[in-house]
């Protein structure tokens, strides 16, 4: 019967003109291999190209007992990030995403690496550069864009919260670190980190033993660097920069930072005898200057 057919293991291989990975993201000239088991899809690989002609591959593996892994590689990081999350401020570059989903209640974890990508008209970064009186960099960001040779983003996802801890962006003109979270439903955000202008030259002292550790502080930071914070929502956020932190060595600069809450919220379970509400409670309005 139909139920038994759905549980029958199958192997599929196909060459497809178009494979829709998700709405807005199609793979052209795709070579597809997939396997299903009694629990559903167990293995999936697809290689092809994106709409702009750049190479694109995706893989999913649920054959291991610990959970499932996912891998996405693209020859155009800007195109993929726009298709996946609607981010239109990245151009070009390469992207590699690896992730793991566990079978228990642990958060899903992802590591995202982008290389040789250009950032242009990023709203929050433009505000940070302006508040830091880095007008030249702000103008470049709004014009040809700022080049980052590498961006690394460690990401956790659970209960609707996207948590970033220790993300780094490095380029000849600018370096950044950031940690914080975004709530998927409400769009609430809270991030903070360090901004390093002239990153290549500014962080060179980090290679000096002992002295480098003292004045630079942490990996991804430089001698002259400013701390920043973003809080509010995606639509309306408060951006602040601490100019005094630019004068402090790396270790002392920790005093000026206000670490964001990067905890994963625990899911609240409903008691068995508690009735299911007919409607959600109103969300309190918050204002951010």
Language-model region placement:
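Surface-exposed, gly/pro-biased binding rims or lids
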Residues: 196-239
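Solvent-exposed beta-strand/coil patches in large extracellular/periplasmic or lumenal scaffold regions
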Residues: 1-196, 230-244, 251-289
